[in-house]
Amino acid sequence: MFYKNFKTVTYCVAAWVNRVTEEELRKDADFLQKYVKIDKIYLETYRDEFAKREQIEMVKRVMKDYGIEVSGGITTVTPDLNESDKKRQRLFNTFCYCNEPMRSRLKEVSEYTAGLFDEFIIDDFFFTQCMCEDCIREKGDRSWKEFRLAKMMEVSRDLVIGPAKKVNPNIKIIIKFPNWRESFQETGYNPGQEREIYDSIYTGTETRHGAQTDQHLPRYLSYSLMRYFESVAPGRNGGGWFDPFDCDRFDTYLEQAYLTAFAKPKEIMMFCWPAIAGNKRATPLGFMYDKLDMILSHLGQPCGLKTYIPFNSQGDDHIEDFIGMIGVPMEPVCEFPEFGENTEIGASRKVLLTAASLEDSQIVEKLRRFVEAGGHAIVTSAFMIGALEKYPEIKELTSVSYTKRTLTADEFQTPAELPQFKNYVKSNAPVEFPLLEHRNNATWSIMNAGHGEYHESILCYDTYGRGRFTVFCTPQMPSKLYDLPAPVLTTIRRELDASGIWLDGGSGVSLFTYDNKTFGLYCYAWDGCKPQDLQLHIKGSVKELVRIPDSDRPQMFKPQVIKPLYEKGGETVFSGRVIPGEFDFFEIKE
């Protein structure tokens, strides 16, 4: 391995494998080993066409000369195999798994690949959206969700894993999950069950340009989705996968790499060989990987506010990422973090529930037990609205109700330093929230929003048993979180803090926390970005912050040791400046 903490890998698509010459391959390899330093490739055997065996063997031979490890890969897309396939309206040429010729083709692909490699990965087109007559007939009375979840498990067992292991009993098969987690169940992706039958998994961390692509993904997903899938298959999440497409500037591409690395992956996958060989966007990668590798050697395990996202769930899409973008360290998990009296005090005692959490039919009872035992649960407004309708027993925990009206706010009332006092701040433009009401003094408001003489709470809490239940009202358009005034964001961060560290400042800065008293800051290089001054609050008495080095050469204009401004109220406060496109990591010295 070129790096101590991760392998750098790339992917070679079948069409390119078929046309590349040995001379071109060696020229590309020289470029990549100079600028990126590749440890491993996944060599694709099928994507609309089979890669020829002689070409595969040539690529493997050349990679051996460069000391590059080679595994296989397949992408489950295929052209029409006969005239009848023209009736099937297939997105991206994905397979119809009710069609026997296509089923036979996939089985053939699996067997072919297993005969060439001891490991292969399935790219994230392993889904179905086909609604042809054959699919309608086989679905019967089931919903498309039910049908596709069952169908893709059957396809995995009977057409991929079974045939491959029959050819090569030692084969290891990896399934890559896409970056559209909220839609998995509607297309057949089934991580809750697929994790049990595949040897390992992989994570799509492509976020590209968040505002100019059809998915509109917050950059933080490149970190948070890695962490979510680590909870899905602990120790078996093989890595994060991103690409240079729809990246209008260097930083847009590089930030995908940074955030993937901050999540501590085993592998960092840069899709794909022909897209990065000779691409100027790839030229800084090796330089930055050296820096990241040195930093990662000092970091413990990532930690943050656990966010419960059950399997096959949808709702509040990517709210955990929007919150991560405003500086709250997030730790999405697939199982509810229940605890008892003997559980250690820490992040496990705080959990965020979103509308996706409502997929769990036992969620309110789990929530009640969690809070009563001393936990602090935060729920989004979308969770609260859905729970009031679906699980009215939620009223046991709070007086909050939903009016079915909208709160338009440009004035905010935030806590002042002195108890019982308030500060007032205006936003640059109105922000809309769902209007939730509460009964004064039964539920206590931390922060209000509104206009003129009408305000309602957007952050309030109840006490229940030994715990605390907070309702966090998020904007109707989640990206409007970025537009909230700094004092509003600071109040949110303080209430949601699960790591003992919170930021006082504006948006566009993410905080990454680890379980060994280390943390990092990253200021996004997005439109309109600029250096930001902020304050950092750390629980307890802290002597100093020591910068974690990213090279053997000290950074001339960055202090290596930061002394506190002051200590007050059980916290130590530091001041600092963050620069767009630069990451800064520190060790807390007590």
Feature locations, PLM:
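Active-site-adjacent "subsite" loops/lids of carbohydrate-active enzymes
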Residues: 5-27, 55-116, 129-132, 158-159
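A short, well-structured beta->alpha microelement
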Residues: 20-30, 323-347
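Surface-exposed amphipathic alpha-helices with a cationic face
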Residues: 1-4, 33, 57-71, 157-172, ...
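Hydrophobic targeting/anchoring helices
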Residues: 44, 83, 118, 123-124, ...
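Active-site groove signature of glycoside hydrolases
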Residues: 34-49, 90-146
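A conserved amphipathic helix/loop scaffold
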Residues: 355-589
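Short, well-ordered secondary-structure micro-motifs within conserved domains or adaptor modules
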Residues: 340-358, 378
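Short, acidic/polar
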Residues: 16-35, 99-113, 183-194, 222, ...
